[in-house]
Structures are given as C-alpha cells and as structure tokens.
Amino acid sequence: MPALNPNDFALHDIHLFPVCVFRPEHATPGYAPRWEGEIDTLMRHGEPFVIVYVELDNDESHDDRKHRAVWLKQNKVALGAVCKALVSVEPDPDRRAEVAAQGEVAVKAFGIPHHAVASFGQAVSLAARLTRQHSGNDALQTGQQA
C-alpha cells in the first residue's frame, strides 16, 4: 500500500490519518479535479478513513459541485469501501440538526454515512471507532467475539 505524504494534499489535512480534515480555504473555484486526485490517492492507500468538515461553508461553485457529484456517483462503491463516514462538526445544536438532515440527502445519493457532531474531539473519536471497526484488526475482532 502506498504511503501517504501530507505534503501531497492541499484540500485535506491528513496529519491525523485516518482523520482527513477538509480545508475549505483551499477549495477555490476549479478545485474539483484536485479534490478528485486527493480522494483517489486516499482510496488507493486502501486503509479506512473518515473525512471531517469543521467549517461548513457552502460556497462551492456549480461546476465544482457537478464535477464532484458525477465522480461520487461513478465511484460510490470503491469510495464506500474505504471512506467510512463524512463527519460535520457543528457546535450549535439547532444548526447541527440542520446539517444532519442535509447529510441524509448525501447518504441517499452517494451511500457514504454522515454524522454531525458538536466538537472536533467527538469527530476524532468517532473516526477512530469507525475505522477500527472496518480495519480488519483480527486481534480486536477476536477479542470482541470471545
């Protein structure tokens, strides 16, 4: 499995892999091909991961949104094999409920589970749990089955 180099990623901070934090400040118009390349790299790596969105701006251009939607539909199964969830961090409970509802639409369209949590710490804990469940860690699974 190819090693991941954090310097190869502009749109995702992978220093806490399997937590991949989306960097909206780098998502300027025309970013979708770069996004696709980074997601392809994460998929080729082959280990389960979670993408965390801390800043929930929705200023994506129509062209970028369309590019990503087409790619997500075409790669739904392959991405779902390694991307265990999209996690949105939203401290405000009312806004978090809205984000969770919006996430359900994406789940139906692209098949990747979505979670809305109150803090980055909760996102990291959830990511650890989700990726551990799917990592094929035989010792952990054996311990749970015993």
Regions found by a protein language model. Name each.
Residues P2-A146:
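Amphipathic, Lys/Arg-enriched alpha-helical "gate/interface" segment within cytosolic domains
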